[in-house]
């Protein structure tokens, strides 16, 4: 790549759930803009992160994991991921380096796309025998004409700088679209709601994380500089309310405390966070609610 040529482009990060797509985006951007957990299907929306390079700018798009659809919400998530295959300059297909060789993923997702695709083998730090990595790279290369196959660890950062440098070589010429101090085009209210939802994913189990949506009802800055936020945790069934609140309110307090810590880091100021719980029965199957919560 010629260093004196300005570059700008869109790069979509796609793959199955729980392969480290959001962790990779956060690592590239250098800040937490996409939530993560050890549960699949944590990401529900397309998340854009903006990375500036010496001679240009890259907009990376994190996407929901591609999975079987069991609800309107799931379908909307997969539709968002598949939409991210279009109108971009490059695709990064992220897979678990130690996982199965997923020929169906390649066939269903990449079949017919004319966009250049790089394969990103993530979590290589978890492979005890590096010879396995070479075997996996060879096996994947038989499935699709990937432009590059790049082993990385989004968690530790291993190989990520090299990935960014390689991506730059595939960008078209162009001028930056965003100011160089912008990390994402997402509104703060959206990121705040996501940070609360992340804590629910990390602290609760079974169906609770998947039955939860979060909406920020108010967001105001007080004269003393404290930001006061009121957010609703929306559940699908009345019997879930006691679980999210917990004994003597302990679970709700824990969610709020951990979320407030992240929100204060995001906003750079003290935060007063009020959480309350309400029931929106079967919201994941109701088109009106999916639109209200930003999932359609």
UniProtKB/Swiss-Prot annotation:
Segments forming domain KH type-2: 204-281
Region of interest (G3), residue spans: 62-65
Ranges for domain Era-type G: 7-173
Region (G4): 122-125
NCBIfam families: era (TIGR00436), PRK00089.1 (NF000908), small_GTP (TIGR00231)
Species per Swiss-Prot/TrEMBL record: Pelobacter propionicus (strain DSM 2379 / NBRC 103807 / OttBd1)
GO biological process: ribosomal small subunit assembly
UniProt-recorded name of the protein: GTPase Era
Coiled-coil region(s): none
Keyword GTP-binding (UniProt): yes
Function description: An essential GTPase that binds both GDP and GTP, with rapid nucleotide exchange. Plays a role in 16S rRNA processing and 30S ribosomal subunit biogenesis and possibly also in cell cycle regulation and energy metabolism.
PANTHER family reported for this sequence: GTPASE ERA, GTPASE ERA, MITOCHONDRIAL
G5: annotated segments: 152-154
Membrane-spanning ranges: none
Location in the cell: Cytoplasm; Cell inner membrane
Family membership noted in the UniProt record: Belongs to the TRAFAC class TrmE-Era-EngA-EngB-Septin-like GTPase superfamily. Era GTPase family.
Swiss-Prot/TrEMBL keywords: Cell inner membrane, Cell membrane, Cytoplasm, GTP-binding, Membrane, Nucleotide-binding, Ribosome biogenesis, RNA-binding, rRNA-binding
One GO MF term attached to the UniProt entry: GTPase activity
């Amino acid at each position: 790549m010629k260093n004196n040529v300005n570059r700008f482009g869109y790069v979509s990060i796609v793959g199955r759930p729980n392969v480290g797509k959001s962790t990779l985006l956060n690592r590239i951007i250098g800040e937490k803009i996409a939530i993560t957990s050890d549960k699949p299907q944590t990401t529900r929306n397309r998340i854009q992160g903006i990375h500036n390079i010496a001679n240009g700018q890259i907009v990376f798009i994190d996407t929901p994991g591609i999975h079987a659809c069991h609800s309107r919400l799931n379908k909307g998530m997969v539709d968002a991921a598949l939409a991210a295959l279009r109108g971009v300059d490059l695709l990064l297909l992220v897979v678990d380096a130690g996982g199965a060789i997923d020929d169906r993923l390649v066939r269903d997702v990449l079949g017919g796309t004319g966009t250049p695709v790089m394969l990103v083998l993530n979590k290589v730090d978890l492979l005890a025998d590096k010879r396995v990595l070479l075997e996996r790279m060879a096996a994947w290369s038989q499935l699709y004409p990937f432009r590059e196959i790049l082993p990385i660890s989004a968690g530790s950062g291993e190989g990520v700088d090299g990935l960014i440098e390689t991506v730059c070589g595939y960008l078209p010429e162009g001028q930056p679209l965003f100011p160089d101090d912008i990390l994402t085009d997402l509104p703060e209210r959206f990121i705040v709601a996501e940070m609360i939802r992340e804590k629910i994913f990390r602290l609760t189990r079974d169906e609770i994380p998947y039955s939860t949506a979060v909406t920020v009802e108010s967001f105001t800055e007080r004269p003393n500089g404290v930001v006061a936020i009121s957010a609703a945790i929306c559940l699908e069934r009345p019997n879930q309310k006691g679980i999210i609140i917990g004994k003597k309110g302990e679970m709700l307090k824990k969610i709020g405390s951990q979320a407030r810590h992240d929100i204060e880091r995001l906003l750079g100021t003290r935060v007063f966070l009020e959480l309350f719980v309400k029931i929106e029965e079967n919201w994941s199957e109701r088109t009106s609610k999916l639109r209200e919560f930003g999932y359609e």
